[in-house]
């Protein structure tokens, strides 16, 4: 009944209008869009970050590489999204530009947090513009600092998530997309520090299998491993049975 009253009064028609109960309804609707998207799990491991993403059903008509959900932002940053894929594409390109501009200007790699903050700022602005809707996408960024802790200030491997409102937080492990709350509950119970990247992928797949039940198939999943080898970042992408 409350939603109907808000709709009748027009509070759900603009991203810039607060409802009397303090909510911005267009933002809340956008959050529902994210939970319709396929899920992804990110886990900080020992000297690495892993992301495992469900692309749902495999279509034999689609070229597999073109549907991979793990995106390289820079040689030391990867990202995945849940929600409207076209919205995600715009923000991914923005993140790449931010990272490259930092390299050109300062002759060094941008910190993961600085890239995430720029993307979060863009998302926040679209909760205030009249005539524009919020970005219907949540994004998870994994990053690593080659050679030590100095650049991030608090650890070699990091994981950040941005939400609809432009807020961002750092996590040890997190999930976005369909069934995210169920997945996060299982992560809280099973996550351990200093997992190897292989153990991190195994944990993510075990959780997906438990959540999806009979619908689970290894062929549905993409994985990204971001690690440091010989003082340099390395991104390895895997799909399907390569994750086992």
Language-model features: where?
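Long, low-complexity N-terminal extensions
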Residues: 1-244
């Amino acid at each position: 009944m409350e939603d109907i009253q808000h709709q009748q009064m027009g509070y759900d028609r603009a991203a810039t209008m607060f409802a009397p109960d303090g909510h911005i309804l267009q933002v809340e609707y956008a959050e529902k869009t994210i939970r319709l998207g396929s899920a992804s799990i990110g886990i900080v491991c020992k000297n690495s970050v892993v992301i495992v993403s469900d692309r749902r059903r495999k279509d034999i008509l689609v070229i597999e590489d073109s549907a991979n959900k793990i995106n390289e932002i820079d040689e030391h940053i990867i990202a995945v999204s849940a929600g409207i894929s076209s919205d995600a594409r715009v923000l991914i390109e923005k993140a790449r530009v931010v990272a490259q501009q930092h390299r050109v200007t300062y002759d060094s790699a941008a910190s993961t947090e600085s890239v995430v903050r720029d993307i979060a700022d863009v998302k926040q602005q679209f909760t205030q513009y009249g005539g524009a809707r919020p970005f219907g996408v949540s994004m998870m960024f994994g990053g690593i600092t080659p050679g030590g802790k100095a650049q991030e200030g608090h650890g070699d491997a990091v994981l950040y998530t941005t939400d609809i409102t432009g807020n961002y937080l750092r996590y040890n492990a997190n999930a976005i997309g369909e069934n995210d709350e169920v997945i996060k509950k299982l992560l809280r119970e099973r996550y351990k520090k200093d997992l190897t990247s292989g153990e991190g992928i195994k944990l993510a797949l075990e959780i997906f299998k438990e959540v999806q039940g009979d619908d689970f198939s290894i062929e549905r999943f993409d994985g990204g491993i971001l690690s440091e080898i010989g003082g340099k970042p390395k991104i390895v992408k895997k799909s399907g049975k390569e994750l086992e």
